[in-house]
Amino acid sequence: MLDKLRNVIQRAFKKLLENDSFLLENDLHERAISHWFAVYLNDEIQDSFRKEKYNVDCEYNRDITRSDGRVKKAFLLRDEINAEFKNSYECQPLEYFGERSVYPDIIVHKRGSNADNLLVIEIKKSNSRFDNNFDIHKLEAYTRSEFKKDILKYKYGVFLVINVCSESPPSPKVFWFSEGKKIDQNVY
């Protein structure tokens, strides 16, 4: 499964470079890059996981399986993030980053169920003014299985650091997570 996902991510990124290098070369917003990566990822997921019928969504914020209608985000991260970064910023990190930043950039899942949250992806541009720790901490939490409160439990997480502002962008760094830990690192 992991090798299959690695290939899917690699092919989707290749399509992004082939079709939308303008976004990277001109340092467009991370959301624009994430959107087009998700479009190509969806194509690859549908081809590679046809029987499973996964959905690919950007900044998905609903969990309709909850009786209280709470949004599908990492509420459990609030205290952890604030504790982890309390010495790094003058204000509380969630105020600094904005509450919306605890929504994943891209997820691969089945809508209407938490039984099969396959993949959560965080994308960051190489020239971001924020360090990687915040995104890494989110991916560790999204992939932990012991949390029952928010039932996130993604099987895998990917942190994709994309190089921008170059005529031919070099390969991105890809960090893989599972069970709340970094398990691998690739360069495509």
Regions found by a protein language model. Name each.
Residues 126-130, 165:
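Short acidic, S/G/P-rich loop/turn micro-motifs used as interaction or catalytic elements
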Residues 120, 131-162:
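Short, charged, amphipathic alpha-helix that recurs within catalytic cores of restriction-modification
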Residues 12-16, 115-121:
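Glycine-rich, often proline-containing surface loops adjacent to acidic residues and nearby aromatics
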Residues 105-108, 117-126, 139:
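Conserved catalytic cores of phosphodiester-cleaving nucleases, focusing on short active-site segments
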